[in-house]
């Protein structure tokens, strides 16, 4: 559980600040010109960024979670394997949601603004959700909570699965938005 708290704050901070300029920085420094003159679709361009960042984030998170699992078993006792993988799988969907927010904001805004909006969406909405979240149980921002519930029992199945569905729909919506913004902002590329 302590590892989750660290991932939720420092991990999200690293993800957002590390990748907020993924697309916007290429527009600003002129590298985007080399890409936009090629016959490549904006969907391919956006998804290539999303896949690479998602892979880096998921591999990093899984290495950290597997290490934590190993040391927890050594020091404190057995953690059920099925519960651990349900926890890690749920948390992976949350990580992909965060990555999608960051890349979509980078396609839309300059680097500083993309980082700010991404941090507000990821961290501030989580704080609001923790304060007022008792009034709604289906939200992408609930996934980290549902992930930890796999280790302490199991989350309410209906709310959990609806949150997964809503998150996947939000990911698709953010990808569509990011592709559209990549196309719209291509003309802002410096030469």
Residue map of PLM features:
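Secretory targeting signals
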Residues: 1-22, 46-119, 149-168
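Terminal transmembrane helical anchor/hairpin motif
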Residues: 1-2, 115-191
């Amino acid at each position: 559980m302590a590892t989750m708290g660290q991932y939720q704050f420092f991990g999200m901070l690293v993800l957002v600040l590390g990748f907020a300029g993924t697309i916007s920085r290429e527009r600003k420094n002129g590298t985007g010109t080399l890409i936009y003159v090629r016959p490549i679709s904006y969907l391919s361009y956006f998804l290539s960024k999303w896949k690479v960042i998602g892979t880096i984030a998921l591999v990093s998170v899984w290495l950290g979670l597997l290490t934590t699992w190993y040391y927890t078993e050594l020091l404190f006792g057995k953690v059920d394997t099925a519960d651990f993988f349900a926890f890690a799988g749920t948390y992976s969907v949350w990580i992909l949601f965060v990555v999608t927010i960051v890349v979509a904001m980078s396609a839309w805004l300059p680097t500083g603004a993309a980082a700010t909006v991404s941090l507000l969406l990821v961290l501030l909405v989580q704080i609001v959700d923790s304060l007022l979240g008792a009034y709604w149980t289906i939200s992408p921002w609930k996934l980290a909570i549902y992930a930890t519930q796999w280790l302490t029992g199991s989350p309410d199945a209906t709310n959990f699965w609806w949150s997964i569905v809503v998150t996947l729909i939000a990911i698709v919506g953010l990808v569509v938005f990011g592709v559209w913004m990549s196309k719209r902002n291509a003309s802002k590329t410096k030469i």
